[in-house]
Amino acid sequence: MSSRISVSLLLLAVVATMFFTANVVDATPRSQGNMMRYGNSLPAYAPHVLYRFYNSRQFAPINKRNNAEVVNHILKNFGALDRLGDVGK
């Protein structure tokens, strides 16, 4: 019986310590200089940032090219290479 009491008291002490330290950390004051300087200029929610991110190219569907477009791309961009110069002739 005494072991149950000691374990419960130890558990209660640990929970109380965690509760009080969490409240102390949450209660630390913020510097008023930064809040006055930046607080009013920054919006709380900026959906345009999300729209710009999700409309970027990495989320766009992949467009497949046909073989002629691939060959034209290679000839246009790598035409200076000797081996690729005579592909279309």
Swiss-Prot record:
Q: How does a null allele present? A: Delay in the timing of the reproductive peak of egg-laying.
Among its keywords, does the record have Transmembrane? no
Q: Hey, what's the signal peptide range on this chain?
A: 1-27
Q: GO:BP terms for this protein?
A: adenylate cyclase-activating G protein-coupled receptor signaling pathway; locomotion; locomotor rhythm; locomotory exploration behavior; parturition
Q: Which UniProt keywords apply?
A: Signal
Q: What does the UniProt function comment say about this protein? A: Probable ligand of isoforms a and b of the calcitonin receptor-like protein, pdfr-1, a G-protein coupled receptor. May not signal through isoform c of pdfr-1. Involved in locomotion; may play a role in circadian rhythms of locomotor activity. Modulator of egg-laying.
Protein name (Swiss-Prot/TrEMBL): Pigment dispersing factor homolog pdf-2
Query: Gene for this protein?
Result: pdf-2
